[in-house]
UniProtKB/Swiss-Prot annotation:
GO biological process: alcohol metabolic process; fruit ripening, climacteric; response to ethylene
Organism per entry: Actinidia chinensis var. chinensis
Tissue specificity annotation: Expressed in fruit.
Domain of life from the UniProt record: Eukaryota
A Pfam cross-reference name: Transferase
Family statement drawn from the similarity comment of this UniProt entry: Belongs to the plant acyltransferase family.
Positions annotated as active site in the UniProt record: H167 (proton acceptor), D382 (proton acceptor)
UniProt name for this protein: Alcohol acyltransferase 16
Annotated keywords: Acyltransferase, Transferase
Length: 456
């Protein structure tokens, strides 16, 4: 477990934002989003960032020019991203495919990649506003660009690719599909993308008549009595390598250590530490919501190339006192229950709930949402400069933590977790986490690797 040194000071020179349009004419039409896409809980912008080191074979190539031209080519196939969202009857979202383009910013910074990526990543990317400028008037959901991209060159020859996505358009795998297409064109590919994009958002439209077949704890409308001010929130990132995961597993009885995935163990640990840090009353209802990918579910049959949202975040309910004081096995089993709820039928039940209940926001009170992006593919996007030294979400949110794949300076592969908590709770969280990751209950042990699919 490690945290980043104090924020660096550096200067970024940005050109005026421009709009990148598809390189060829595209259809002018209206396209409805699915009833999973346009739920209230996805009507926000999510930032992703990738850092690339200098590559000798790419000397003389300007990443700004390469990305801008590849983006224009990709938008021919992903032309809805060049449009704007409008709202129809009953708040139904639609893309007006206007070919207005996506926002693009060219920038230079007097800093090096290695100064930004240390033993872990900067907590909350305190410099994110420098590498992904919030263009005034672009932050809305309706009538605004659906993508904002900034390419920043560093003095070392490395560079950063930062993108802000209107989450109603795509989930993480959908965004990776778009980025992969941009990367293919950046490396000189011609013709169509290797995976042709599929719109077909009616695939996840509500059924007629709607039929809510599950109890959805993640959408229960509960009065939030918490008074934390989001302005007092602080961000930190934590690295979990083999040593840290072994330490967490050592808190389980020997017979239990090999039967749970790293995701299950890590999520249970974080949920417990977070619950303790927030000082919640023991009887208070708490939830864990695990973002779960519907792709690959035998009862869903998602079309190959579909880039809309295909995930839900099924939740289980417990009490703060149970999570804080019960055995860690109990917490792991609760996490497993949440994951097990995700099926194709569950996702269709969510779509039906959205149109029946008026697209409710996910539960805020006592909820903790975790999203595992370690196997989504952000860390494999190659624009010609090789794989990024970091690729993944750029910021946590008060209720949401993201997991991303990361290799620290010692060459250890692991998971970096972005955490956002009130300032007063963050210190307690770190203290609780230290107990879990640095105190061994007994000696070393062996466990078999449990493979799990990404949950976003």
């Amino acid at each position: 477990m490690a945290s980043f040194p104090p924020s660096l000071v550096f200067t970024v020179r940005r050109n005026e934002p421009t709009l990148v349009l598809p390189s060829k004419s595209t259809p002018r039409e209206l396209k409805q989003l699915s009833d999973i896409d346009d739920q209230e809980g996805l009507r926000f912008q999510v930032p992703v960032i990738m850092f690339y080191k200098r590559k000798l074979s790419m000397e003389g190539e300007d990443p700004v020019k390469v990305i801008r031209e590849a983006l224009a080519e990709a938008l021919v196939f992903y032309y809805p991203f060049a449009g704007r969202l409008i709202e129809g009857p009953n708040r139904k979202l639609m893309v007006d495919c206007t070919s207005e383009g996506v926002l693009f910013i060219e920038a230079d910074a007097d800093i090096e990649v290695n100064q930004l990526i240390g033993d872990t990543i900067d907590p909350g990317f305190s410099y994110l506003d420098e590498l992904l400028h919030d263009v005034p008037g672009s932050e809305g959901i309706l009538g605004c660009p659906l993508l904002l991209i900034q390419v920043t060159r560093f003095r070392c020859g490395g560079w950063a690719f930062a993108i802000r996505l209107n989450h109603t358009m795509s989930d993480a795998p959908g965004l990776v599909q778009l980025l992969t297409t941009i990367a293919e064109f950046a490396r000189g590919a011609e013709g169509a993308p290797s995976v042709p994009p599929v719109w077909q958002r009616e695939f996840l439209a509500a059924r007629q008549p709607p039929s809510i077949t599950f109890q959805h704890h993640e959408y229960e409308q509960v009065i939030n009595t918490t008074t934390d001010d989001n302005k007092s929130m602080t961000h930190k990132s934590f690295f979990f390598g083999p040593k840290e995961i072994r330490a967490i597993r050592s808190h389980f009885p020997p017979h239990y250590r090999s039967v749970s995935s790293t995701f299950d163990v890590l999520t249970a640990c974080l949920w417990r530490c977070r619950t303790c840090a927030l000082g919640l009353d023991p009887p208070k209802t708490v939830r864990i919501s695990c973002a779960a990918n519907g792709r690959g579910k035998h009862d869903l049959h998602v079309p190959r190339g579909y880039y809309g949202n295909v995930f839900a975040f099924p939740a289980v309910v417990s009490r703060a006192g149970m999570i804080s004081t019960s055995s860690l096995e109990y917490t792991v089993e609760e996490v497993k229950k949440a994951k097990a709820r995700m099926t194709g039928e569950y996702l269709r039940s969510v779509a039906d709930l959205m149109v029946t209940k008026g697209r409710p926001l996910y539960t805020v009170a006592g909820n903790y949402i975790v999203s595992d992006t370690t196997r989504v593919g952000f860390d494999a996007i190659d624009f010609g400069w090789g794989k990024p030294v970091y690729g993944g979400p750029a910021r946590a949110f008060p209720l949401i933590s993201f997991y991303a794949r990361f290799k620290n300076n010692r060459g250890e592969d692991g998971t970096v977790v972005l955490i956002c908590l009130p300032e007063a709770a963050m210190k307690r969280f770190q203290d609780e986490l230290k107990k879990m990751t640095e105190e061994h209950v007994d000696g070393p042990f062996e466990y078999k690797l449990i493979k799990v699919m990404s949950k976003l």
